Amino acid sequence: HTITKHFAPILPFTCDEIWQDMPHRDTDDGRNVLLNQMPESFEAYALPAETMARWDTVMKLRQDVNGVLEKARADKRIGKALEAHVTLQTTSQELQKACEGVNLAEVCIVSTCDWSAPEEGAEVAQGVNFPELTVGVSEAKGTKCPRCWMHSLDANAEGLCPRCAEVMAKFPDLA
């Protein structure tokens, strides 16, 4: 409901189609999404300060990784970011704690990312945002998934990574 109202100024036709097919509150004008009041406050949607701080840390780490990815790309060690295996090493327990439970490979848009020493021959650099961080970038190992382009050591017979294989198993008609 609220998202439809928020996106209406930039996606008016799409939001109006959604609006026409959804149930409405008594205070809504059901004729068109643009005939309704926008929510006055976004405070109800704000994340807690500690969550914002955590994601700020994760995004700064991503900036550090992207800098090393660009250098590795310029040095022709990798082509696309999805062809990269990233290693992270730090003495900061706070930085590791902020990244706990976060899929850093997904956040950094690389095939694999883990907390370990850089591989031999990897592009290695210190973090700009986190000088105590060492980022290593090397070529990802494994088979390139034809569906998501991630490289995986656990590809199935069709070459699909485990994640894509799981998704495709739910839709056997598409296989």
Regions from the PLM with identified roles:
Residues 1-68, 72-92, 96, 114-117, ...:
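Acidic, turn-prone loop/beta-hairpin segments
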Residues 21-22, 99-102, 151:
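Residue-level signal for well-ordered alpha-helical positions
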Residues 140-143, 155-156:
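Flanking scaffold residues of small Cys/His-coordinated metal-binding clusters
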Residues 145-148, 161-164:
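Short cysteine-rich clusters marking metal-coordination/redox-active sites
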Residues 150-156, 169:
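Short functional micro-motifs and their immediate structural scaffolds
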